Every structure is written in C-alpha cells, then in structure tokens.
Amino acid sequence: MLMITSFANPRVAQAFVDYMATQGIILTIQQHTQSDVWLADESQAGRVRAELARFLENPADPRYLAASWQSGQTNSGLRYQRFPFFATLRHNAGPFTWAILLICIAVFILQNLLGDQPVMIWLAWPYDPSLQFEAWRYFSHAFMHFSLMHILFNLLWWWYLGGAVEKRIGSGKLVVITVISALLSGFVQHQFSGPWFGGLSGVVYALMGYVWLRGERDPQSGIYLQRGLILFSLVWLIAGWFDVFGMAIANGAHVAGLATGLAMAFVDTLHGRKRA
C-alpha cells in the first residue's frame, strides 16, 4: 500500500475518498493524529495524485459533495482506535524502527542487570587489535545507553525520525542510513575518545540532518523536520562541545552523524534537482 496524503480534517479526507470511488479507484483512511489516505493499487498513484491536486485547489467543488451523496454513506467511514496514543506509536513506525528500539531497550536492561562493563566488553567498538574482525562491534555500540535520560532522548528521536523515513521512503533507506551513520560516527568518536562509548545519538543526528535536508530539497518525499527542531539540535550540539551540561557527550559522533545525514540527503536529491 502507498500513502497518498494526510488531512487534518477527516471529513475533507472522506470527501476525496468518496470522489475517487466514483472514479473507480478505492482509497482507505487510517485515522491517527491525522487522516492518512492510502492506495492499495500503486499503479494508480499517478492518477490519484493528479486528482488530489485538483481537489486541493477547490475542495468545495459541487462534484465532490455529489460524490459523497452518491456513495450513500451517512457516516464518516472512519474507525477510531480505542487507545489512540498506542495506535500512534505503532502506526508511525515500521518494523526496522521497532526492531532497533526494542534491541536498545533489551541492551539497556542487560546493562542494569549485569553492569555496563560486561555488556561493553561484548558490544563496544574494537578495543584490541584481536577484535577488529568482529564486525558487529562497528555498529553494536549504538545499542548501549548509560542513563534513563540518555535512552529516552535517543529513542524518542529515533521513533519520530526513523519512523518517518521508514513509513514514507522505505525500510531499505532507513537501514542504509543507520548502518552508514553508526559506522562513521563510531569511527570518529573512537578517534576522539577511544573505544568506550555508546548510544544511538550518532544515528539520530544523521536522521536529523537527512530528514531536514531531504524535506527542504525534495518536499515530495513527504518527510520534513521543522526548522525550530533542527535549530534545537544544533544548539544541543554546540552546548555539548562546551560541556554546558557537565556530562560526557559523544560530540564526535554527533558531528559525524549530522554530516553523514546531510551528505546522504544531498546525494539522494541531486538527480531530482538536475532534472528540474
């Protein structure tokens, strides 16, 4: 299935769905924070988007009202979740987003049960030449977190940004961003502080950079990050360099992650800009 658009007003969404039904195209609505309109037959996407553009120009056109009457529906056709908060958590993230989130939680529980050191011995960046062929270590450092605030902050951003990328662009793209940014941010942080570090923040900063620049250069992608949030991330980044918070922060990983995300977004939007 392909998500076509989202409407803040569920009645407007229903009007568009009703009209498309009269054109022989079946759309469905999933109600979460907004009314998401989905298309099952992706081969019809071009026609649906063309009709959507006309609909948005004048949603009050009588033909749309007539379509709603023609559908014979006296209700909105929407199904509301009994627990909308949990429905939002579930539907705003894909399987890879949830897999990483659950792995991080499981590792955090192990750290609290066994202590940080035993877990780091297995998951930390290679701290001895004999470990350099243990390939998982170049990525598994991202699963470790050292305080409740640390893991909550990272996983909230991971769910918000990673979920958006996975839902709008696909799991493959999120996997690529995660793997590349974990590797590069880990390498840079290792140069700064040695192998004893952890956290998903390098990947999170990569997602911040990717989502913001991809949204600026390619609005059609459906992902974006408000400029206020990217400004907040930059302030947090600068504050970390000057030790404003008085705690150990993986500044090298943050900078490397952000640069990685920006670079990947630039490359992904380069061809589209050239065609334009």
From Swiss-Prot:
Keywords: Cell inner membrane, Cell membrane, Hydrolase, Membrane, Protease, Serine protease, Transmembrane, Transmembrane helix
Enzyme Commission code(s) on record: 3.4.21.105
Gene3D superfamilies for the chain: 3.30.70.2350, Rhomboid-like
Membrane-topology annotation of the record: Multi-pass membrane protein
A single BP term in Gene Ontology: proteolysis
Claim: Cell inner membrane is one of the keywords in the record: yes
GO CC term (a single one): plasma membrane
Subcellular location: Cell inner membrane
Active-site residues annotated for this sequence: 201, 254
Transmembrane regions listed in the UniProt entry: 94-114, 142-162, 169-189, 192-212, 229-249, 252-272
One MF annotation (Gene Ontology) recorded for this entry: serine-type endopeptidase activity
UniProt cross-references to InterPro entries, sorted A to Z: GlpG_N_sf (IPR038236), Peptidase_S54_GlpG_N (IPR022732), Peptidase_S54_rhomboid_dom (IPR022764), Rhomboid-like_sf (IPR035952), Rhomboid_protease_GlpG (IPR023662)
Reactions accelerated catalytically: Cleaves type-1 transmembrane domains using a catalytic dyad composed of serine and histidine that are contributed by different transmembrane domains
Top-level lineage group: Bacteria
Annotated function: Rhomboid-type serine protease that catalyzes intramembrane proteolysis.
Similarity comment: family membership: Belongs to the peptidase S54 family.
The protein's name in its UniProt record: Rhomboid protease GlpG
Protein species of origin: Klebsiella pneumoniae subsp. pneumoniae (strain ATCC 700721 / MGH 78578)
High-level lineage: Bacteria, Pseudomonadati, Pseudomonadota, Gammaproteobacteria, Enterobacterales
